[in-house]
A protein has these predicted regions:
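A conserved FAD-binding loop/helix module that cradles the flavin
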Residues: 1-57, 140-157
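Flexible, glycine-rich terminal cap/loop adjacent to redox cofactors
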Residues: 45-52, 60-157
């Protein structure tokens, strides 16, 4: 979905979506597979690592004008007990400011946030669009400035 080009992304989630399309069509339907953005998440040694869309290296190889932004923030309100670091990297096209991909590393809230980026990729959002997202706020679970919003604000500078 990001590049419009075919890609090999061997994930169970992709296989399930394609299976659903195949099953519906086998029963006489007209379903189409819309594509994927390649969202992946793993937990390793207490950290959650997630990616979606293109990496900076992939974007460069496809001749995008790559704009990389990396920030460190807190996964919940910084003054709330248990707040931990979370790192967000956004990859955007410098010519159009369209989001091309992102990676997130932290202890919690990573999968939810990479899903926000995947939704942004699916809808071809720009960095400015990300800045305008209305994300949740509650000190024990979500800071007033979500790390995605912080990264988008830094990327817009």
């Amino acid at each position: 979905l990001v590049t419009g080009r075919p890609d090999y992304i061997p994930l169970g989630s992709t296989a399930n979506k394609q299976g659903r399309v195949a099953g519906e069509n086998a029963a006489g339907g007209q379903a189409m597979f819309g594509g994927v953005v390649g969202s992946m998440v793993v937990r390793c040694f207490g950290l959650v690592v997630a990616t979606t869309g293109l990496t900076a290296a992939q974007a460069r190889a496809l001749d995008y004008d790559v704009q990389e932004t990396t920030i460190q923030a807190q996964d919940i309100a910084h003054y709330f007990p248990g707040a931990a670091d979370i790192h967000v990297k956004l990859i955007a096209d410098g010519k159009t400011n369209r989001l091309l991909g992102g990676q997130i590393v932290g202890q919690r809230g990573v999968a939810k946030r990479v899903d926000v980026l995947a939704t942004a990729l699916h809808n071809r959002l720009t960095i400015a669009d990300l800045q305008g997202l209305d994300l949740t706020y509650a000190p024990p679970v979500a800071p007033v400035w979500d790390p995605i919003l912080i990264a988008a604000n830094v990327a817009a500078r």
